[in-house]
Amino acid sequence: MEKGKVVVLEDRVPKLKERRRQKANRRLIAYLSFFFLFILCVLYFQSPLGAVGHVEVSGNRHLTAERIISLSGITKRTSFWKVNEQNVEKKLTRHPEIKEATVEKQLPNTIAIHVREWRRIAYVYDRQTFFPLLENGRLLKQEGTKTAPSDAPVLVGWKDGDAIAEMTGQLAELPAAVLGAMSEIHYKPTREYEDRVIVYMNDGYEVSATIRQFADKLSHYPAIAAALDRNVKGVIHLEVGSYFVPYSPPKKEDGDETTSP
């Protein structure tokens, strides 16, 4: 009979105790690490380090960065980690001038806000005040200014809301270069053309057109103006076809005086 191996238990007991002690130490270290990490997190969230440190705003044109930050509801006391991007975006797009908004968190404590504003397609002149008209047809009656704008044409003599709405749609279809070349658009209906308008261009010409064909006709304005003698000003008629009538006699200084078609 083969003799079996003899295991000396006294030799294994110290090793088992050492393993148990090491295992207990590792467990204690893990518990202590978790505890201190928890304490650090609590201190971080309660300290200024856990609050929003900076808000960056981009894409705004007419609304100031301060106004947009105020609309977002974010302050220096706001917890960085409690900022909900989607909720802030919804708050911002409730403003009539903001078309789109994107909010992004950037470590360690910066909030980046990018907005797209509705384009100001024109300004309605009423009671010596210029009211912005957005491309979506909304008139900003609370944003009126006494200073004449230069970024969009001014609508003068427009009282008919339906006519303004139709004109807004036409202006929105125009290239930016043509829209920027206009100074004023006067509502001047006649018996023959009930939707007739007179456009005063920045280059000194006048354009007589109708609202219903405004975008289609005015989109060709650069080519039409380029074919004319720049030293001879007058009225470009675009109601039916297109033709040019020079001022005769020379145009007076009265801004409301126009040449009848």
From Swiss-Prot:
InterPro entries, per the entry: Cell_div_FtsQ/DivIB_C, DivIB, FtsQ_DivIB, POTRA, POTRA_FtsQ_type
Single GO cellular component term: plasma membrane
Extracellular compartment residues: 49-261
Pfam family, one: FtsQ_DivIB_C
Region (Gamma): 231-260
Location(s), subcellular: Cell membrane
Region (Alpha): 47-117
Presence of the UniProt keyword Cell membrane in the record: yes
Any single biological process term in GO: FtsZ-dependent cytokinesis
Topological category with respect to the lipid bilayer: Single-pass type II membrane protein
Family: Belongs to the FtsQ/DivIB family. DivIB subfamily.
Described purpose of this protein according to its UniProt entry: Cell division protein that may be involved in stabilizing or promoting the assembly of the division complex.
Domain commentary: The extracellular region contains three distinct subdomains: a membrane proximal alpha domain, a central beta domain and a C-terminal gamma domain. The alpha domain might serve as a chaperone that stabilizes FtsL. The gamma domain is required for interaction with other divisomal proteins. The beta domain might modulate protein-protein interactions of the flanking alpha and gamma domains.
Name of this protein: Cell division protein DivIB
Gene responsible for this protein: divIB
